């Protein structure tokens, strides 16, 4: 991971009460959603254009540090259970630094998972371009980002404490609004 010339934001989030540093620009509502290349369970790449189906659908991107932690697992389960609250065509993806094989194991253990699992392990483009890469830990910060069909960011929640959960109701309402 190359981190030269990246913006650093210290104190935007904490880990167990201690300030940590996020790398990359802060995502802002109304800005064009940055590009990314993420890896699926079959090791193929998914880009922003593919996820948005070239402007035919919006995307709800759920960034978690690791599915192997209780809070990340619970968060992913809750979003999976509440997918029906989003009308229309919205791609819903959990993005983590976990290897695709670990993501597949998590899905197998859960059973009926409708979320798309995407890994940022290869080049960290999602974490760095969306300002969610934690310098000290090499994980993604916990965040929910919604990209509208036109490719702009329409919702951002970067959870202030890594061990806390996001606001599910607000995120799902925002996703429904862009569906």
Annotate each PLM feature.
Residues 1-179:
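Chalcogenol-based redox active-site neighborhoods
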